[in-house]
A protein has these predicted regions:
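Short, structured coil segments at secondary-structure junctions
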Residues: 30, 65, 122-123
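Short, hinge-like loop/turn segments at secondary-structure boundaries
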Residues: 51-55, 87-88, 127-130
Length: 130
């Protein structure tokens, strides 16, 4: 299996064992092959903390299934910013664009729980998990 990128919605679905995670590669493969942008990691962490999970517990929960965290560097920021015209009609956030930019940069598939992403044609496979 090759690397693949997870967005925050997919990471949260995996951590909370929500419907749709069965369409993703097996847990052992996620640990070894997933990559997530530091922006999306912060987003997932924030959502768990907002649900009342203590910050340290939330951090441990989201870090457990992750293979690699990609720093949001200037090159990544430029690519994410450049996606605004291709994505704004769908209402994608900066976090969404950071995720997509990482997948484009790495040339790998991306997994999301956001159905609207299926309308994108960015030259990378986009897998909607539900």
């Amino acid at each position: 299996l090759s690397k693949f990128v997870l967005d925050a919605s997919t990471l949260l679905a995996f951590v909370k064992e929500e419907p749709g995670v069965d369409t993703m590669p097996a847990e052992s493969e996620i640990i070894s092959f997933s990559v997530i942008s530091s922006v999306n990691l912060a987003e997932a962490h924030s959502k768990l903390v907002m649900k009342g999970i203590p910050a340290n517990d939330a951090w441990e929960a989201i870090m457990a299934p992750i293979g690699e965290v990609a720093d949001f560097n200037p090159h990544h920021a430029k690519r994410a910013g450049g996606l605004i015209l291709q994505t704004r009609h769908l209402g994608l956030s900066l976090g969404d664009r950071a995720c997509l930019a990482l997948a484009i940069e790495l040339g790998v598939p991306v997994y999301t729980a956001d159905r609207v992403w299926s309308q994108l044609d960015l030259g990378i496979p986009i897998h909607v998990i539900r």
